[in-house]
Amino acid sequence: MTGHPGPATGADRLRSAALLTATAAQVLVPVVGPLLGQRPVGEVSKETPSIVTPPDWAFGVWGPIFAGSAATAVVQALPGHRTEPASREAGWWLAAAATGNAAWEFVAQSGRYRATPPILWGIVAAAGAAHAALQRTAPTATARLATGSNGMLLGWTALAAAINTADVLLATLSIAPDSRRGRAVSLGLVGGAAAGVTAVVAASRRGAAAVASTTSWGLSTLAATTARTSVRATAWAGVSGVAGGLLARVAKTRRTRDLFG
């Protein structure tokens, strides 16, 4: 990795520290919270009925997302990389996304699950802004790492925000998820999220496959485990749409590695 010439400023060091702190927080909150009396996120979320939540094992996707985020934070904090365009252009957005993740985990674990949708959409907005910023930077190794790890976060949280919003909205309005209206809301939001991700994937010069991978993972695990035909059809249609967006991007991409970061 080649650093950007020029000495690091106080702003560079502050940004790097913020990113490291936020990245550590998003990993530690789910571990420390239950030790301090909070309930695990999975336990709290199951109290809100849903027909569109992927199976528990699908959430293992957070492993590679967190690993990529940690690697990005460490690399951007190194003296030779604090001043890289990728660090300066996207660092604060990456820190905002990680902070949002930690906040979402804390609020959910404290039992206020219905307050979480706005936080999730904030994460999506921050990750989306970072993704857009990274499209404009030179494709250095540092930039590729950030683009890939953030792309996975963007793809997963875009779907998660739609599912979370549907579940909380139906619970707030006392609408049964498996009713006609409930299915319309849930499947409409999931389909809308898939369409939005498809558009992002098709338009991304770099990191398209990273974004597509986690959305497709969530949708395909949902489709493979649900007993509801309408949910299965919507999920597979979403996977097909995202795959179509990725194929459109592949046709325009000269370097295969650009698809990943």
Residue ranges and their predicted role:
Residues M1-G261:
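Short amphipathic, positively biased membrane-proximal segments
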